[in-house]
Amino acid sequence: LASLDPANINALDRGSVHNYSGKADRASDVLLHGSLAAPALLLAGRNIRSDPGTVAILWGETALVVSGITTLTKFAVRRTRPFVYNPSVPADAKTGIDAKASFFSGHTSFTAANTFFAARVFADYFPHSKWKPVVWSVATTIPAATGYLRVKGGKHFPTDVITGYAVGALTGFVVPELHKAHRTGNTLSLVPGWDSIGLIWEIR
């Protein structure tokens, strides 16, 4: 711990080493867990209620993909969390395995994946709905707020949450899109594995 020097951190992230808030940390947990309701709320739509199996499979695949990417990256990078640099934080909080899991933010990536998935599926099933702008506004705001709270809580640097947001949003948007049937009937599917993600192109 004594060898850690904030001066070695890039200018964008450096100021985050002074952040540490249990309240912000707990609030980010609430947003993460609350985002799990977003895919479930899709069932309120009549069109989607008639096709729950497909939506459930797509959401499960989205969760597996974002989980795999996030976990593999954390273990590969092992970036030290901002609070570890903070001298006011107790030493015992800085020595756990979680202290080196900063890059990238799992809370942000999972939240973005959930909300963007819900918005993407809603837009597909209700392409002419007047609620689409509202749905997309909520979908983009919740993970942004989650990322802010993770930085405020000292758990992540700004670049951690920006990356997490991008990965989660891309996953939540792309997985349903890849499964959409085109006019040709051809489909492209993501197949998550333990240590990789594959693509299957099916021609009908």
Where are these regions (language model features)?
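N-terminal transmembrane-helix/juxtamembrane module of multi-pass inner/ER membrane proteins
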Residues: L1-P39, A76-D92, D98
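Soluble non-cytosolic domains of exported or imported proteins
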Residues: S21, D25-S35, S50-D51, W59-S67, ...
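Solvent-exposed, amphipathic alpha-helical segments
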Residues: A40-L43, G147
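Structural signal for the C-terminal ends of transmembrane alpha-helices
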Residues: L43-I48, A119-A123
